[in-house]
Curated annotation (Swiss-Prot):
Cell location: Cytoplasm
Keyword list, A-Z: 4Fe-4S, Cytoplasm, Iron, Iron-sulfur, Metal-binding, S-adenosyl-L-methionine, Transferase
Short name of one Pfam family: TRAM_2
Gene: rimO
Annotated [4Fe-4S] cluster 2 binding sites: C152, C156, C159
Cofactor(s) needed for function: [4Fe-4S] cluster
The keyword Transmembrane helix belongs to this UniProt entry's keyword annotation: no
Domain Radical SAM core: 138-375
Name of the protein this chain belongs to: Ribosomal protein uS12 methylthiotransferase RimO
Length: 446
């Protein structure tokens, strides 16, 4: 039923893309609820639909355009936001779907709300008490993404994110701490710290000092993590470049303040290709840093992502990448075949790699990594670990995660049937076996 004279206006929402986009969606949804809008999960009952898009690679662009088209077909009133909305100042989306009501870029909640207000005025008497203090979230209650900055100062040749989200803009640390405290009070037991470049947090603010609860707090990733570590929940860091000052986080991991886990987007192992990517090209220094991290924190889990088939990548470059992979022994790895992104400087680099070769290299890469992952997971068999219940599967089977695994992108711990457990519970388990991706265990104590 659509909104009438006495019914609140209803908004449908489709959120695509990365965790940073998820946080943008949550902020918009929270404000909509505060203004009295109802949020619905189907096109038929919505008065207007918002589609938060991704535009990073071709597959994401296609998915976003399809989602916009479906929303137009099923509902007819659509507001588009997100990274794809920033392409060509919105003309790219309008060219494909001229009937959309409005197009905005990422991190533009105000513009999205203005477009919704124009199409569907808010109720005159919003009940702000309908919104929980931690806001509305798209993740399960037991974990939450905590975005600490917008934009990026890097100029990687394969990426157009800076042109979409702009230069680095760090949030004030006291603002982040207030949000984190509200999330924990609302039931979050894990905070996943995200940004485009987490280690660069505070550079734009010149690391100025703020105050939280009367205590000084520097706008610096080490100080922020130390403060988050006092909240008594898992704190997991994503999108961390291997800057030298990341070494300062290791004592916090050793003390149990933050998880011994780093998501480090390395992208390649060949200095020549790294230079073409406009990434730090000293792969041997990165390898030394990884080995140093592991000496300081033996339980450290390192996740990374790589690109194969980058323009100009030769067999020798790919062999260097595999050598790097074997030497680094990373725990969790994702690999993508290079996909040209409209507007990226890498498109002008000569030596395009044929698609079949890209896929062959990707398969070879993942075969090497699978053996490494299997071996590293096997070392945990026989250990006792504290895990977080993530989901209940068919037949009462329990799916959990250890401190080594981020939601959705890493592995899980399969526990079989375990009576009395609920999503969000902590439980101690004994690891009984492992494969290349997941662990298997039995409950020791809840």
């Amino acid at each position: 039923m659509k909104a009438g004279a006495n019914t609140p206006p209803k908004v449908g929402f489709v959120s695509l893309g990365c965790p940073k986009a998820t946080v943008d969606s949550e902020r918009i949804l929270t404000q909509l609820r505060a203004e009295g809008y109802l949020l619905v999960g189907d096109y038929a009952n919505a008065d207007v639909v918002v589609v938060n898009t991704c535009g990073f690679i071709d597959a994401a662009v296609e998915e976003s355009l399809e989602a916009i088209g479906e929303a137009l077909d099923e509902n007819g009133k659509v507001v588009v936001t997100g990274c794809l909305g920033a392409r060509e100042g919105g003309d790219f989306v309008r060219g494909a779907h001229p009937k959309v009501l409005a197009v905005t870029g990422p991190n533009q909640a105000g513009a999205v709300l203005d477009a919704i207000h124009a199409a569907l005025p808010p109720a005159h008497d919003p009940y702000t008490d309908l919104v929980p203090p931690q806001g509305l979230r798209l993740t399960p209650p037991h974990y939450a993404y905590l975005k600490i900055s917008e934009g990026c100062n890097q100029s990687c040749s394969f990426c157009i994110i800076p042109s979409m989200r702009g230069k680095l803009v760090s949030r004030a640390p006291d603002d982040i701490l207030r949000e984190a405290e509200a999330l924990v009070a609302g039931g979050a037991k894990e905070l996943l710290v995200i940004s485009q470049d987490t280690g660069a947090y505070g550079v734009d603010r010149k690391y100025r000092t703020a105050f939280h609860n009367g205590r000084p707090l520097k706008t610096r990733i080490t100080d922020l993590c130390a403060a988050l570590g006092e909240l008594g929940v898992w704190v997991r860091l994503h999108y961390v470049y291997p800057y030298p000052h990341i070494d300062e986080l290791l004592p916090l991991m050793a003390e149990g303040k933050i998880l011994p886990y780093l998501d480090v987007p390395l992208q390649h192992g060949s200095p020549r290709i790294l230079k073409a990517m406009r990434r730090p090209a000293a792969a041997e220094k990165t390898l030394d840093r990884i080995l140093g991290w592991r000496q300081a924190v033996p339980d450290l889990i390192i996740r990374s992502t790589f690109i194969v088939g980058f323009p100009g990548e030769t067999d020798a470059d790919f062999a260097e990448l595999l050598d790097f992979l074997r030497a680094a022994e990373l725990d969790r790895v994702g690999c993508f075949a290079y996909s040209a992104v409209e507007g990226a400087p890498a498109n002008a680099i000569a030596g395009a790699v044929p698609e079949p070769v890209k896929e062959e290299r990707r398969a070879a890469f993942m075969a090497v990594q699978e053996a490494i992952s299997r071996q590293r997971l096997q070392r945990r068999v026989g250990q006792r670990q504290r895990v977080l219940v993530d989901a209940m599967a068919r037949g009462g089977r329990v799916i959990a995660r250890s401190a080594s695994d981020a939601p959705e992108i890493d592995g899980v711990v399969h526990l079989g049937k375990a009576a009395g457990l609920q999503v969000g519970d902590w439980v101690e388990v004994a690891i009984t076996r492992a494969d290349a991706h997941d662990l298997y265990g039995m409950v020791v104590s809840a």
